[in-house]
Structures are given as C-alpha cells and as structure tokens.
C-alpha cells in the first residue's frame, strides 16, 4: 500500500492521485492514515485579493526555516469538463523546486460550494504525511469561502482595500467564518481606513477577530501573520471538535449518495417533466425509493 511521506513527493503524489480519482485501492490508503496534529490553514477571499501571492510569501518564510509545507490549491471546474481550468499557480512557480514544499492543484468537480469531499480526503492524506503546515487556498467563488471553514483549523480571509464598498457583505458573511482578516496590498490608498473599519466590525463579536495588514508581494506583515497562526494553533478551542463533526457529515453525505446515477436522474427527470401532473417532490420520493 502506498504511504504518504513528506520526504517522498513521488509516492505522495501517487497516493493523492489514487484518492482524487477514487482509483482501486484508495479506500485502503484512507483507512490506513495515521493521525497527526498538522494545522490546516484555509486561505480564502475574493478573486484578486492576492491569495496566491500571500501563500507564496508564507512558503518563502517557512521553507527558509526548514519547515515542510504542503499546499492544496483549489481550482474551479467547468460543469461540462472535469479538468482543472487554472492549473498550478504561476505565482508559486519558484516553489516547485524546493525539497520541503509540496504543491498540488485540485479541481472542485462541480461541488456547489467550491470544495468537495476529495478536498477533505486529500488534506487528510497530507496531514498523515507529517508536514509542518498545510495550506488550502480557494478561488473564493460561490460558497467556498464559507465551506472552507468546515475544513481548516484556521481560516484566513484575505481582502483588499478596494473591498470597502462591500463591507456590509463582509459583516453578514465572512465575519462568521474568519479566524483572522488579512488586509493584503496594505500599501494602497484607503488600506488603513479599511482595516480600521474591519476592526470595528470584528469587535462587535464576543471574540474580536484579529485584522492583520500585509503587503505579500514585499513580504511585509508576514511574520506577524505567522505569529498569529502559531498562537491560534496552540490556543484551546472547541472548533476542532466542530470540524471533525462537519467532516464526518460531509463524508457520510458523499458515501450515501455515491451509488446514485446522475445521468440516469437527468434522463428520468427529462421524461417526467413532460407530464402535466409532474411534481418534483413526488418524483424525488419515487426515484430515491427505487435507486
């Protein structure tokens, strides 16, 4: 059986490929995973916030310290093509030759929120490989920003000063899942005002959310961000218990629906809607009872 190891990237890549594509033997890999306390750090936020640049800066810092770091870069997938649209991040190209940095892209494969069960499984394979840190970067589309909170031990929401017009949206949505806000490109006009507004909003919560300003392209603020990550990881929290329950729920949903044939569903539905007495809820009850 393949074993995941942070020092054998070839073997690790093979194990991840088997799991990602549900190839024969992948269940044995998952069932044989050993628990490790490696923190999974979710990095999310809107497109253009500089998430890949921030990841690159974190990798530079940790790799220089001899830390082993893995990155799962989540890419969107066309519903008509299961291939990844973005591929490996160009901005992280300099990291690929480092012996202690492992980067893998993962297509979302039509998961409505941008994250899939495969994200959970592959992150657990990486955790079992004993990396020091695991970064999961999403494209920040749909509900992936919220769903990553169900995967990551620490969720960093990356924003830029230009997001000031959307501050109310931030208040109602991302405020609920952020363990810290990272105001990237903080050398731009309006960055201080934006960061202060975020701080005021975060202070309305029972536990205020830290706001950390960075200029990732110049590595400014990275040490402060890493200090927060290390502090947060060592702090007692009920989040880990909630995380494992959320993961179990997603994995159970996937297992229970694995036998359903989506193409057959579409075909049967296309025929059923032609009937004048069509009722979607009756159709679902009838269809699931025979599946």
Tell where the protein language model's regions lie, with residue ranges.
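Nucleotide-state-sensitive switch-loop elements of NTP-binding domains
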Residues: 2-41, 46-49, 58-144, 154, ...
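Long, well-ordered amphipathic alpha-helical subdomains in the mid-to-C-terminal portions
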Residues: 12-14, 213, 224-291
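Conserved glycine(s) of the Walker
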Residues: 50, 54, 221
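Short glycine-/polar-rich loops that comprise or flank the Walker A/P-loop
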Residues: 67, 99, 151-154, 176-179, ...
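Conserved beta-strand segments of the P-loop GTPase G domain that flank and frequently precede/overlap
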Residues: 105-106, 157-160, 182-185, 213-215
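Amphipathic alpha-helical transducer elements in NTP-driven molecular machines
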Residues: 112-116, 120, 142-145, 149, ...
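Inter-motif core of Ras-like GTPase G domains
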Residues: 124-131, 143-162, 172-182
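Canonical P-loop GTPase G-domain recognition
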Residues: 177-180, 186-234
């Amino acid at each position: 059986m393949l074993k995941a190891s942070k020092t054998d990237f070839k073997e690790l890549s093979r194990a991840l490929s088997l799991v990602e594509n549900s190839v024969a033997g992948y269940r044995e890999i998952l069932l044989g995973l050993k628990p490790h306390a490696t923190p999974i750090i979710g990095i999310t936020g809107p497109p253009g916030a500089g998430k890949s640049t921030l990841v690159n800066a974190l990798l530079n810092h940790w790799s220089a310290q001899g830390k082993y770091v893995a990155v799962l870069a989540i890419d969107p997938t066309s519903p008509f093509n299961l291939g990844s649209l973005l591929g490996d991040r160009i901005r992280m190209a300099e990291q690929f030759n480092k012996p202690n940095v492992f980067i893998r892209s993962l297509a979302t494969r039509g998961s409505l929120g941008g994250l899939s069960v495969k994200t959970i499984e592959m992150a657990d394979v990486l955790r079992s490989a004993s990396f020091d840190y695991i970064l999961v970067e999403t494209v920040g589309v749909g509900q992936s920003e919220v769903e990553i909170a169900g995967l990551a031990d620490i969720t960093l929401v990356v924003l830029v000063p230009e997001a000031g017009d959307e501050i109310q949206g931030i208040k109602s949505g991302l405020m609920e899942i952020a363990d810290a806000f990272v105001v990237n490109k903080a050398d731009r006009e309006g960055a201080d005002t934006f960061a202060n507004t975020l701080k005021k909003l975060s202070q309305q919560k029972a536990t205020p959310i830290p706001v950390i300003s960075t200029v990732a392209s110049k590595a400014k603020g990275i040490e402060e961000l890493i200090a927060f990550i290390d502090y947060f990881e060592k702090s007692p929290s009920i989040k880990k218990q909630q995380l494992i329950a959320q993961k179990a729920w997603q994995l159970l949903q996937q297992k229970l629906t694995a036998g359903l044939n989506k193409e057959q569903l579409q075909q049967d539905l296309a025929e059923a809607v032609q009937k004048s007495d069509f009722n979607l809820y009756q159709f679902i009850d009838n269809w699931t009872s025979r599946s």
